[in-house]
């Protein structure tokens, strides 16, 4: 069973999909920057046989609205918590891809007693470097002037070059979904990522739940060496390096992901 649902959060509508059966253990799946629920349907359907999966469009992305000109990672985490309140879900696992991983870490900081597992997909816990902030500012200027050109360059770059042809349809779907996003949503997310703090301390101590890290061997956005800088921290219980780029969970050809 799949249902489209929504909840009001700070005056904006947050849209999400609900998979599986009520009463099963809950998993929240959070897409990343420029991503929508559309790209994660195969993963949600894979998990729906064991879990009830809540697949969320983050603020300013997909069908979810904007609450302001800056969406901090903490704002995004609060929006996810609003969805969980609406579904009356107290205990859950969370899987976040890229920016969604930053949101998952914020949830790990905010509600650790409610978590039953964390999966960090092609992401990291560190704050932006000055170099990274400069790159974001340049990207924001391009997005302001010509959103279509910005997306045309950004979406295909998510996968390893050798996978681009095989995943052409998936990338087309992602690009079409991204074109519907308001520029405000793109800029607000970039601003929020620049403001996020270092949360690596959360992973330096053992947690009461499993923490799984999934990386792409050829990830152009978050290189494998960045992931390796933290994946031996005490909280990490499992490490997986998949073939592919930033969408490694998709590029690896249906590799089973789970806790």
Where on the chain are the PLM-derived regions?
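Conserved hydrolase catalytic core segment
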Residues: 89-129
